[in-house]
Amino acid sequence: INWLKLGKKMMSAL
C-alpha cells in the first residue's frame, strides 16, 4: 500500500 498516495487522496477528500 502506498501511504503517500493514500494520504494525499484522503487529504483531497477532506
From Swiss-Prot:
Record function comment: Antimicrobial peptide. Has activity against both Gram-positive and -negative bacteria (B.subtilis (MIC=9 uM), E.coli (MIC=65 uM)). Shows mast cell degranulation activity (EC(50)=15-26 uM). Has low hemolytic activity (IC(50)=100 uM). Its mast cell degranulation activity may be related to the activation of G-protein coupled receptors in mast cells as well as interaction with other proteins located in cell endosomal membranes in the mast cells.
Record GO terms (molecular function): toxin activity
Entry's localization field: Secreted; Target cell membrane
Protein name: Mastoparan MP
Post-translational modification summary for this protein: C-terminal amidation is important for activity, since the deamidated MP-9 analog shows an important decrease in both antimicrobial and hemolytic activities.
Residues modified to Leucine amide: 14
Miscellaneous comment text of the record: Most of synthetic analogs show a decreased antimicrobial and hemolytic activity.
